[in-house]
Amino acid sequence: MIPRNLVISIVIMLAALAGLGLYGLHLRRQAAELLKAEADTKPVAPPASGPTGQITILTPDDDHGDLVRRQVAAALPPEPALRAREIVHVLISQWQEKNSTHPIAPSADVKEVFLLDNNKTAIVDVNGAFADQHRSGVLVEELTMASLARTLGANIAGLQQVKVIVDGRERETLAGHADLTGFYSTNLDWHVE
C-alpha cells in the first residue's frame, strides 16, 4: 500500500497543476482580448478643415511591383505642413482599405510632417505601428517608401526629398529592408501606371 502522505502530496500536486492550467487558459483569453481591443482603438484624427480638392496619390501594387496613379478628393488645410500630413493620412487610409493592393496595419498612421528648406525636404513622422507591423520584404518596403515620396512630390510643389522617422526618432530600417537613415527622392524612377 502507498503511504498516506505520498497520496496526499500527489493529490495536492495534481490540483495545483490543474489550477495552473486553468490560470494559463485565462491569461491566454485575456491576451487575445487585449490584442483585439488594441487593434480597435486607433485614435481618430480630427477631420481636416479646408476646401476639398483633388490630390494625386500613387498607391503600390504589390502583385505587379509598380505604383498606380489615382486622383482622390480630400479636405486640405491651407498650411503646407498640415496639408502634407493630410496627404500622407489619405495615402495610408488607402492602404488600410479592405481590398488594398498594399495592405498595412489598421493602427498605422502619420503623426506629423515637417517641411524644411522652403518645402524642398519633408520629414514624415509615423507611429510605431506603421513600422512594427509593416510586412517585411524588399519589394513591399521599397514600394511603401516610393509611394510616400512620389505622392508627396506630386502634391507639394518643389519638394525634392522625403525622410521617414518613427515615433520622432530615426530608425535604421522600415521592417528589416528599406533604409530609413537616408532620404528618398520624390523623383524615384519607379514604374507608374
Annotate each predicted stretch with a short phrase:
Residues 1-193:
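Bimodal "functional hotspot" detector
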